[in-house]
């Protein structure tokens, strides 16, 4: 397959002239370096992947999850190149897929989903909050690599980070839930955010999509079927090839590696696994799982780390090698949109079983949900205090940004950006400084 991609996909919003002696790196190698060396990426080491597991230092953080997703992402690309060499020129380089997987979580706030719910509620009248939208905002404007364009990444890299290529105003439910009388009464399920890009970042989104023809742009922003209720959010249908690979890598890292955490930390039992996962995997329709599930179950719960790790590696490999590139069922003209990576249906069923098991027996258990609830309350307390008297309580540099943003009535977004960037520990420390009588500065 002959591919001639528009050189505009290598462009940067700010045509920078860096002083770099003998720099022979590709644009995507430079992108990877910028992400890896960013403060936003470093902070992921102090944002826990699954809350309530941190009594043991074995647990994964957002940073280790991102590293694992990157390793899986490059593995997906390598095996597609072997299996479908005709797509070799179209597929992302290792540096590009690495960049996407390393950056995909940097917009996540402290305290995971609890923090996301809290910020979305507090920003309900100011454009909302969502982790993927925040990731896009960090790389395009907030991270101080350039004055106005964030990390100033290549256009194709930014396209690959657009999991939901539409504005939040287009995806948000037509009828929002009513505000609560007191934040302690806030139900998480009512304030789960819509997925998309902040309306205030429209200029950055427009720049990324500039090389696309009008029909491709229109199609890319298309929604899935209308929701059954005006209280439900709408969802976008399409994403780029690079993004589809990153998303599969993320799903596999979540479904399989978080399962490993849960087993080693004793959060799930053999009986729970047998009933809620092994039985379904044996019937998922894939011959590999049907043949090996009994042996895999033995290995996972053997009590020996190296045996469990071997089983985890086998599952990752089985999922990874069942992914291939196929045409998207839509008339896109641009090759980056006309093809996506898909997992074989039976293996897709198996991945859904694993993700559901992790959600049901790890994420949704009271031990984890109490941590998320606590974080949710803590973040809302911080937002309430900082927004009540920002000139008094914000750090000097953030206060300056707030004053400038207030001229366009965007001050709340600056406060939101400040809190979203915090690590779990920093948010907790600031909360103690503001609200605890025992706090010592």
Swiss-Prot record:
Residue stretches making up the HD domain: 62-255
Hydrolase found in the keyword field: yes
PANTHER family noted in UniProt: DEOXYGUANOSINETRIPHOSPHATE TRIPHOSPHOHYDROLASE-LIKE PROTEIN 2, DEOXYNUCLEOSIDE TRIPHOSPHATE TRIPHOSPHOHYDROLASE
Protein known as: Deoxyguanosinetriphosphate triphosphohydrolase-like protein
Entries under Pfam families matching the protein: HD_assoc
Keywords: Hydrolase
GO molecular function, one term: dGTPase activity
Family recorded in the similarity comment: Belongs to the dGTPase family. Type 2 subfamily.
The keyword Hydrolase appears for this protein: yes
Origin superkingdom: Bacteria
BP-aspect Gene Ontology terms: dGTP catabolic process
